[in-house]
Amino acid sequence: RPGPPWVRVTALGSYREVGRAMHLVTTNESKVLVDCGAKPTNNRSEVQPFFAAPEMLPLDNIDAVVITHAHVDHIGMLPVLFKYGYKGPVYCTQPTRDLMTLLQMDYIKVAQAEGNDPPYSKSDIQECIKHVVDINWGEKTDIAPDIKMTMENAGHILGSSSVYMQIGEGRNEHKLLFSGDIKYEKSWLFDAATVRFNKVDTLVVESTYGGPQSIQPTRQQATQDLQDLIIDTLSRKGKIFCPVFAVGRSQEVMMAIDELFKSEKVTPVTVWLDGMISEATAIHTSHPNYLNKDLRGKMLRGGSENPFNSKWFKQVESREQRESILLDPTPCIVLATSGMMTGGPIVEYFKYWAPEPGNTLCFVGYQASGTLGRRLQDGHSQVPLVDKGQTLICLLYTSPSPRDRG
């Protein structure tokens, strides 16, 4: 519209909730969408962001979409835009492009396996891929008539980025930063997030762990806690099953397990990977420049130094193999999707193994309100499960953690 320059950010998801991240940046001349995610919930009416908001329509008025990273709560609904007529570019890093395609295809697969109609088709995903424009960190790009954008490392998952927008020019320039999901310390996989920018007029920052009670352990402490739990469970011939996101947390847990087994503090057991974990891990190996120096060196040297090549990691190849694992009394570890237990193979392991006192359900990631994972984390000893259209009640045995036992 004519008149003095202005910028507006409209929240279309992820505020006062976890998931379905979507922001609309509107100026005199442009409209840019940042992320387009799904909400991790069993309430299907709340899965999608607010596509019907007046500011969003018509979709062909949107100049560009920018994706911060490839977790489903940020990319799960992107193909819906193309289903309903969006034809513009999608800006993201190369790893984000590869991972989001993998996870969107899996999103369809999981929905169909649970008897639900997915919100988009494979052809919508293919249309989305055609419109992706790869961006490297530190590379300034014109994405709209009055918006230049630079992406920088956010330290969260492979290819994750903070989005720095320079809107307008001269004395009317406004600098807007979307942090994306961020990690401030070096992790098993990545360097710490970039936090130095020349100037920021407006900051939109994620706050998943922003509450006064959200005190996170250090990486070293979290690793030690996980390794202690594994040692404790295996000592009583039990099984450990972990709900994980296929991207990011899975690879971190694999590295922690690999370190433990190579230390010879415990006899190694098979670690089953169920879901898209192996495929996501392969994408990590194809983008070594996005990993921290230590891990990149191990992967390039290959052989036994590459933690992801260790012999104890095995992929679950079929439903029949999963059923065999479920009935096998041999101690083992399972990493399975989905990370918040809203679906996926982890639910099968949970139904079979949770009632057994010797087994351990281990949460290694955030559990959003309204998910099965959150109910369990909050201590519910009875939870309803839907199996082939029928509601089951699962009774749980909760054992104290090694730390609780002092």
In which residue ranges do the predicted regions lie?
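Active-site neighborhood of phospho(di)ester-bond hydrolases with catalytic His/Asp-centered motifs
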Residues: I62-H71, Y91-T93, N153, F178-G180, ...
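Conserved small/polar residues in nucleotide/adenosyl-binding loops
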Residues: Y397-G406
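Active-site metal-binding loops of divalent metal-dependent hydrolases
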Residues: S14, C36-K39, P95, I157, ...
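Hard-cation-handling environments
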Residues: L229-G238, V244-L372
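Core dinuclear metal-dependent hydrolase active-site scaffold
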Residues: R1-D60, D134-D191, E320-L327, P345-E348
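Pre-active-site segment of Zn-dependent metallo-hydrolases
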Residues: Y15-R20, T27-G88, C92-V132, I182-A193, ...
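Metallo-beta-lactamase
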Residues: T101-S160, N289-P329
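Active-site-proximal loop/helix segments of hydrolase catalytic cores
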Residues: G155-S160, Q166-V200, E206-Q216, M341, ...
